[in-house]
Amino acid sequence: MLVKTRGVILKEIKFRDQSKICPVFTEHFGKISVILKGVRNPKNKLSGVFSTGNMVELVIYKKQNRDLHLVSDALLLQSPMSARPDMERFTTIYQLIETLKQVTGSEEPHPVLFRFLAATIEELCKPERDYQLVLAWFLIRLVTVLGFEPELEQCVISGEPLIPAAEAMAPDENLYFLFDPGGIAFAGPSALIRSEKRALPALSFRLLRWLSRQNIDALPDIRIPEEHPRRLCELLQDYCAVHIDHNPPVRNRRIISQIRPDNT
């Protein structure tokens, strides 16, 4: 059956002399693998279209009970890696793709998640953005769509409202993010829990809650020290990892930390 859908390229795998295989997270079919015959020939019209991180519209011959589907045609929609070189953008896209590869199962459609992903890719194509802030915006929606949205309104242990107390706290005064049950707790009650938890400065918490309630087009209006979006990205990636059947990609995290601009 010939079908059309949008998708984000998760990986490129060389196949034989001129072809390649790509896992793609698609709008209508979830994660599938496609084969592009002869695409590594520079004269092929699809050469360069199926690069990791690209958003494409693709036409495929999709067959039931097959793990590999042949691409008939494709159109490049967005290419965040082809924009002006930016190391922070590169590392953010790498984090995004690695997270998607972990949490998406084969042929499990997530149309709502794809809509958030499409908005994120579009924002990552723009210059002079806080790319880690964009990723944090996506990750809080990812965990919500996957069914383990953290509690951000009241302490997950005591039930006490978080907002009045958090707004009165100094920016570097800590709350705690508990992985199980997922959500925020005050320092006192969190001491009773033995499951994994992370200290979270009050300002980082307020940012997390703000991100959970805002459209992506509000992000350029906020100015906040870069360590807070970065902290949220690391926290939410780890939170994802403990709620799925995969182990955290420790090696990949080390690579990211080594290539960040502030480590060069």
Swiss-Prot record:
Gene3D superfamilies xref list: Nucleic acid-binding proteins, Recombination protein O, C-terminal domain
Keyword Aminoacyl-tRNA synthetase applies: no
Domain of life according to the entry: Bacteria
Keywords on record: DNA damage, DNA recombination, DNA repair
Any single biological process term in GO: double-strand break repair
UniProt cross-references to InterPro entries, sorted A to Z: ARFGAP/RecO (IPR037278), DNA_rep/recomb_RecO_N (IPR022572), NA-bd_OB-fold (IPR012340), RecO (IPR003717), RecO_C (IPR042242)
One cellular component term from this protein's GO annotations in UniProt: bacterial nucleoid
NCBIfam families associated with the record: reco
General function of this protein: Involved in DNA repair and RecF pathway recombination.
Family matches, as PANTHER family: DNA REPAIR PROTEIN RECO (PTHR33991:SF1)
Similarity comment: Belongs to the RecO family.
Name used for this protein in its record: DNA repair protein RecO
Annotated organism of origin: Prosthecochloris aestuarii (strain DSM 271 / SK 413)
Upper lineage: Bacteria, Pseudomonadati, Chlorobiota, Chlorobiia, Chlorobiales
Protein's gene: recO
